[in-house]
């Protein structure tokens, strides 16, 4: 922020902070507004450095001004901020933004007048930019430089990313600076794929050109010799003029700026396009001339959702504006459909409108109408009476008028079904019963269980059923429910449903078609009068004769109705006759295998009483349960069932309807545990890009899967009556209940089994399943893809899973799992942060949740300060005032979320790259991508695993977290780009190799860089003063002392209050650092203090540790050592006495000597000593810590043993007069041991080869024994490629690990010796126990598990190292800032976003990306600099 904050300084900053945002308002400009403005300028591709001067501000205003009229609120705010900043730079006194804008306008008017005056004086009234690509060559000729591919590429990216939003206009203006009409046309041609927008732009240019011709008429007579012709409108647009003419006009004296004029026309057109694509109001949404109706509807509803209006007003907008603002072709069709048409009907009717097929269809209809005009005229004269439609009122039921004109009081409820709670337009009856009357379904609705018949015995094919006459129909068909005889014909739909019919005494074959409204038969003679009629079908319009009241027999069932006769390719029985004979479509359900469920052993079902409910809740529950019982989801039970679970009801959000809830907590406690089949939700960044995508939602997911019959009794519940008027109605579930712990696991398992055959049959379809959400993607064409989707829906329906159309998303964007998916990108669904005056704990929790969700694609989100507000135990409703830091953090997050950010999809063929940046205050942000600037996903890391840490340690933790996340999503780890120098990392890693594993990475120069602020010395500093420090505190009084004694006779003790032993130890170190020189040796007896400081933290939650860190940074050299307490060590004993006087109770000191003696004999642990000798834990732990035999070297963070994955230590130990050869894997503690006949080189070499055959051995570390130094062992090492090293005492790579393991092995052998006859058997038993039955160290692994983990990690790391070598196959040619000659080739060391690091001979340089050309090393094929310079891009 430092660079941005430097825009204003001193008095100017004071002036800035006195200016009000609004006239008479309280808020004033602050530094944060400048920071915000600089970030916004980067978004608009403008240099934020321009804010530092008045001239720069003026340039920014010139770029922003053309887009102000159509720009967003953010653009206006940016313009206002820059205008105010300009006034401050110029020293113009203003009180508020409005006054600043007025002053700015005055300045602009003055500068315009000056420019006009200057033009009049010089005869040059041109406004042409001096930056246009017309340059003078050495011969003095004006030469045109074509617009560069880089500029065109930038323009294409602008259109792709901004999609004709207001930002497009200033970007176009900047990219086309000084361009000729030919250049401008090149720019327009590159985005010619946007046909609708280009059509609008073309119309605008034609209008402007015509206006130019009107205002600039052609002069009469011939053109004088040597004089140029004046440009016409088409010349300016570049259609009738050559490039040479355009250059001549632009460079003549006086010039005619045809490029600027044409650019102005284009900007006018872009403004119109922007208003259409980014409208401010719903009134501005208009369908483009070639825009598909579906795209227009998407834009209309997207804007409609944002409108601040009531639902009634929105309904009116939909009914009128949607049709009114459609293009002429669509409007004609929509008006013909009538006012009651549904949106689906509109979209179907307007599909393909505007294309050649549509025009051909319109022409065919016009011709058919022309040929039919005679018939129409006859009908109009009355020779033919057409069928008159009887108008009937929905409201009062009377004929002769419609409901809209009805004078009777409005009937309550729906006019179609009579039910209350919805209106006619929202009625679902129309969609559900497409057979025109309420025909009964013997198994209930599709996808629901019948109360009379379970799924197990249901038919397994889809069928068309025709009712028999022995089962008479009522008028509505309602009485049929539940009393149906199954003696009727069943026709499966695996083949065309062709049946024999009898009509007019003739036998014919006809197709039963539930999609046809009318019955149409091929040419035949029927008795009676007929009327001419035109009917439309898939093949077009045909003329037919209409016969009324014709008797017909279908499958033995008789019906009388209207029959049409004409040239039909197949005889069709339509719904007008199918309804009469009681034909129904049935969707039988395949049986889903039930999963057996049991209660936990020894437990019985729940017996919780039902609590009292209000009358309205009882009524609501009764109605819900009645419907569920009809659908077979629940069944009534008697008093024999002793179990019960309470139920209650809540109102649905924004609805008057009720929702039933069952409190299954008690049953969940008693039900067996389930293993969740799916452990997390799929992430869109892991999806591969697919050509066609569909998102489905399975309707009533749980209610489609049956519950184990033996378990159903435990789900019993009761609906009580008011005042106990009647006994309660008892039910139990037949299907998976909502809220029961087993439902998710059983549903997921059942759904996976059901989808498995479809997945096998259609391997090209990718199906992501999470609960009832299905994402289906493929690389098929959209038509083929949708065919497959229909097959999938049929497959699901066969198993009883319905698929609601309203949740079937066919077109992008797809809403899935909280994400918004587009064909080539994804984002999180719209996130709006609430604006509140006061914030409760619950509000802040919700806010943090939203920000965490957004952080997976919005880089830079921070929540640390907001989370700090939630520390401690607080009530959810408690109001929390926001700190200044939290307000700033929230404001920054709001800015980040203002601009929508998208992620891309995963490409398995490309590498994953993860880049991490440090944000400060312990917060890190990262992006995972495969191509620069196209993030797969982003995230943040802010976890502090301890109270004291440093940036390197946190960075390592962040890398490990990102690696785990990547393996979960993509199954592989990314390459890392980290803001830390290799030297810094190696320095820290050499000491703390056991902190964590980290994959291969490369350095990226992204400030702020991570560094180690200080380093501790490995050896005592010669000549430096040595401080022996100690501290003591009394637990009861909380009083303490801290002090030091030096080797030069100095000493100091300070009293402390409200302290602890640990604090006093740290305070003593702080005193020593404060009172010492630049170099100091410090000796402490505190393991706690040593552990904190040796980890080299650079931040801590403890103020005292932060003070120590500050002192350490000031020092040149610091050596820190530890000695055991109370051991009579000179300086330590002196300082211990100093700080203990009057503080420590010495009652327990009598037991220390006895405890030490006991420990030296038996090496008992600290817990045993604390119990047996009544010692404080800290003293007992120090006794163990001071025992060299109880310390396993290399296990603690302070260890210095080399623990590379391939290092083993070998040693011989003796037991029972026999030799045991022991090999220890240093990094894991894994042991291989064997009893050998003799301690010879031959036996040792044989053992070593066996070890190398089992494990990857790189280095063996041995002592100088004769068997290890023998020629046989050396030969074995040479053959197996093993390096042999020899140890000496106190060397960091000494024999400490294997010596310790020898003791451990002997200890275990002693424990199991009586179980084995031979020593060699006991040795192998002990090896097994040590390797697999003892857990210790980081992660609680056994030694066997740890060695496998280490080797696997090492293999992964080496693979990553190989990948990074690939970058060395490139060569770089580069230019210095002043020298235009290309230099090179140089070696590429690192490639970043803004710069590259190269090595040219011995020099290492950092060069901006724009000044380099990166190419592959093609050997001698590249001839010279000219060839290289012609290559425009390295990507």
Curated annotation (Swiss-Prot):
Residues 277-363 are annotated as: Dimerization/Multimerization of capsid protein p24. CDD domains: HIV_retropepsin_like (cd05482), RT_Rtv (cd01645). The gene is gag-pol. Residues 508-577 form the Peptidase A2 domain. Residues 7-31 are annotated as: Interaction with Gp41. It catalyses: Specific for a P1 residue that is hydrophobic, and P1' variable, but often Pro; Endohydrolysis of RNA in RNA/DNA hybrids. Three different cleavage modes: 1. sequence-specific internal cleavage of RNA. Human immunodeficiency virus type 1 and Moloney murine leukemia virus enzymes prefer to cleave the RNA strand one nucleotide away from the RNA-DNA junction. 2. RNA 5'-end directed cleavage 13-19 nucleotides from the RNA end. 3. DNA 3'-end directed cleavage 15-20 nucleotides away from the primer terminus; 3'-end directed exonucleolytic cleavage of viral RNA-DNA hybrid; DNA(n) + a 2'-deoxyribonucleoside 5'-triphosphate = DNA(n+1) + diphosphate. Residues 189-227 are annotated as: Interaction with human PPIA/CYPA and NUP153. Mg(2+) 3 binds at residues 1211, 1263, 1299. Pfam families: Gag_p17, Gag_p24_C, IN_DBD_C, Integrase_Zn, RNase_H, rve, RVP, RVT_1. A motif (Nuclear export signal) lies at residues 16-22. It comes from Human immunodeficiency virus type 1 group M subtype D (isolate ELI). Disulfide bonds: none annotated. Residues 631-821 form the Reverse transcriptase domain. This is Gag-Pol polyprotein. One of its GO terms (biological process) is viral translational frameshifting. The lineage of its organism: Viruses, Riboviria, Pararnavirae, Artverviricota, Revtraviricetes. HIV-1 lineages are divided in three main groups, M (for Major), O (for Outlier), and N (for New, or Non-M, Non-O). The vast majority of strains found worldwide belong to the group M. Group O seems to be endemic to and largely confined to Cameroon and neighboring countries in West Central Africa, where these viruses represent a small minority of HIV-1 strains. The group N is represented by a limited number of isolates from Cameroonian persons. The group M is further subdivided in 9 clades or subtypes (A to D, F to H, J and K).
